[in-house]
């Protein structure tokens, strides 16, 4: 078996062959090359085999990292790796790995800046094999490292999200801990809709991948947590500043830095689009309506309003020349707030008008970002008659 790590040319999407015996794939989108990332990748040597393979897509543009991955493959050839000639971004790297693992029944993510004991995923894969009604499982313990030195360790294990119906499962979901549970083992079939949506949306959003991934699973089946010896340690602090988040999500887009304060609004809106529209994993109109409204309201209030709610003075100053945007802000973002804020055509059109007001318009005849998002939304929501800006 060839131990070399192939270089994937820019704008090309070729995949090294993986064995037909593979049933589990641990996906590692990687960009770092430090002591921690080397330790994480090296820890996988002991568990990769013909049934449980490891797929690493390297975005580092570091030739030393490529050589390191070849040394890893020389020890265990069931760890497969590619080296992107040019960094294709975090979302592009996720898309690459998800496509590469097509045909493998079970999958899980592993970051190169957190720590997951190798048996954490293997135990969950084995549990899912025995329980065909489940879409995801965590077998072990999740720990979040943040805060002051005396309060750094927090239990991040998410409650079991089980129930007879999708809404029963989604009511137990939290848009915060999905950043941890997205790493847990899943049936690949329970992630396809979310992956298709992420690939098509023209506007990324804060925790959008995590939230779509998680709620796609919950639409189809239960997520359980079980005791085990394995563990996941999540360290969110290195990318916690607004500037870091902006650069990661929108640094090369037409959106200004001020848009970052509306990124959670985008997440809420796109959860509504996903679960209402043609890519929704939900089967009935009632399930789509109830679940989309619940998820939209949850993220809108817990994440978006917690940041900008009630800031009338700032909104009047920023949107003084955009009366439609200001009107929507005063309607949706000022108290008193209703018990549930509903996802509908009006609030979607307000969001699109917000993007239109904030974006830098292209000068070369290209379609503005707001219009791209309007077209994208119209394609997925054929019952909505969205206005052209």
Where are these regions (language model features)?
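Short beta-strand-to-loop acidic/aromatic patch adjacent to the donor-nucleotide binding site
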Residues: 104-115
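Conserved donor NDP-sugar-binding/catalytic core segment of glycosyltransferases
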Residues: 121-154
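Short, flexible, basic/aromatic active-site loop/helix in glycosyltransferases
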Residues: 156-177
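A conserved acidic beta->alpha catalytic loop
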Residues: 57-69
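Short, well-formed alpha-helical segments that are part of the catalytic scaffolds
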Residues: 9, 32-47
């Amino acid at each position: 078996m060839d131990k070399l790590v192939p270089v994937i040319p820019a704008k090309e999407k070729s995949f090294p062959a993986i064995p037909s015996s593979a049933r589990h794939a641990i996906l590692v989108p990687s960009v770092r090359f430090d002591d921690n990332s080397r330790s994480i990748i090296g820890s996988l040597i002991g568990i990769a085999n013909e049934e449980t393979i490891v797929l690493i897509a390297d975005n580092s543009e570091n030739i030393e990292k490529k050589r390191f991955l070849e040394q890893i493959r020389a020890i265990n050839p069931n760890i497969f790796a590619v080296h992107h000639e040019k960094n294709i971004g975090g979302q592009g790297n996720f898309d690459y790995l998800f496509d590469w693992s097509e045909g493998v029944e079970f999958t899980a993510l592993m970051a190169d800046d957190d720590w997951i004991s190798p048996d954490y995923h293997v135990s969950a894969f084995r549990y899912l094999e025995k329980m065909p009604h489940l879409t995801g499982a965590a077998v072990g313990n999740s720990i979040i490292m943040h805060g002051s030195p005396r309060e750094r360790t927090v239990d991040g294990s998410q409650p079991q999200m089980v129930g007879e119906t999708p809404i029963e499962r989604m009511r137990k979901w939290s848009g915060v801990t999905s950043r941890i549970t997205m790493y847990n083992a899943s049936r690949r079939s329970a992630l396809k809709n979310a992956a298709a949506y992420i690939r098509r949306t023209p506007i990324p959003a804060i925790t959008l991948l995590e939230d779509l991934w998680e709620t796609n699973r919950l639409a189809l089946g239960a997520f359980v947590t079980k005791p085990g010896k394995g563990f996941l340690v999540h360290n969110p602090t290195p990318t916690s500043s607004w500037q870091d988040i902006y650069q990661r999500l929108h640094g090369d887009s037409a959106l200004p830095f001020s848009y970052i304060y509306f990124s959670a609004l985008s997440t809420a809106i796109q959860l509504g689009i996903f679960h209402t529209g043609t890519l929704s994993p939900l089967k009935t109109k009632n399930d789509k309506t109830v679940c989309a409204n619940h998820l939209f309201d949850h993220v809108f209030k817990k994440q978006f309003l917690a940041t900008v709610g009630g800031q009338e003075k700032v909104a009047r100053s920023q949107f003084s020349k955009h009366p439609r945007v200001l009107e929507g802000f005063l309607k949706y973002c000022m108290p008193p707030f209703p018990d549930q804020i509903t996802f509908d055509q009006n609030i979607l059109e307000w969001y699109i008008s917000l993007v239109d007001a904030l974006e830098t318009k292209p000068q070369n005849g290209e379609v503005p970002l707001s219009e791209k998002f309007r077209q994208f939304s119209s394609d997925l929501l054929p019952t909505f008659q969205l206005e052209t800006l």
